[in-house]
Amino acid sequence: MAVGKNKGVSKGGKKGSKKKVVDPFTRKDWYDVKAPNMFKNRQVGKTLVNRTQGTRIASDGLKGRVFEVSLADLQNEQDAERSFRKFKLIAESVNGRDVLCNFHGMDLTTDKLRSMVKKWQTLIECSVDVKTTDGYLLRVFCIGFTIKDSVSQRKTCYAQHSQIKNIRQRMTTIIKREIINSDLKGVVEKLLPDSIAKDIEKACQVVYPLHDVFIRKVKVLKKPRFDLSSLLELHGDGGGKAAEVSTGAASGVVVDRPEGYEPPVQESV
């Protein structure tokens, strides 16, 4: 038997020793997650956060959260071509009970990527760092696979090293051309139908036939300084309360005062 007192075990029989169990969800609130107006389905879902208590503000706990949503859910379509693409949305501001999100990245599902890799073909991929017109630095990854043409009798369809370099160069050129002259909203609108990948597939047919060409991933490396008005424009609220407040404060109101008027001195504040 051990000698000494066990400080971890308290003597029973004391009144008030049992603490009242409080459900943690009673201290939390639900907020609606709103996607930008580039997508058909603006209501992405709901998220929980602790209520504002003391110096802990609820909106500060929401900002910076990243939500990953399938493109099929964002577009309200059950098309198989949309279900394997995932868009990341980041919470940037809170308006009442709405969490206003912005584009934060795109990715393909793991099962789609694994299903495309097969034998007897060449995998070609590239990555490009491009800056949009509104100051977002994006890293875009592209992937494609060679395919046999109708004339070939071979079992394999391997591309030569010079052809791979040529295809990779064409991928880089097209991605830069499509993104460097667009803002973030324009880039997302091009990612929805994957028009950049289709242009790459057409341009590379001259070098070697390709199939399963996709923009595999998009990362946001750098962002410009946060601007609430541009975020409200993305959500279709550009002429809302924030614009009215700014215009009202800028215009002001002219009040007639007699000459020599002095405001009264306040005794208490």
Curated annotation (Swiss-Prot):
PROSITE patterns on file: RIBOSOMAL_S3AE
Tagged with keyword Protein transport: no
UniProt keyword annotations, A-Z: Cytoplasm, Ribonucleoprotein, Ribosomal protein
Coiled-coil positions: none
Entries under HAMAP family matching the protein: Ribosomal_eS1_euk
Subunit structure: Component of the small ribosomal subunit. Mature ribosomes consist of a small (40S) and a large (60S) subunit. The 40S subunit contains about 33 different proteins and 1 molecule of RNA (18S). The 60S subunit contains about 49 different proteins and 3 molecules of RNA (28S, 5.8S and 5S).
Protein name as annotated: Small ribosomal subunit protein eS1
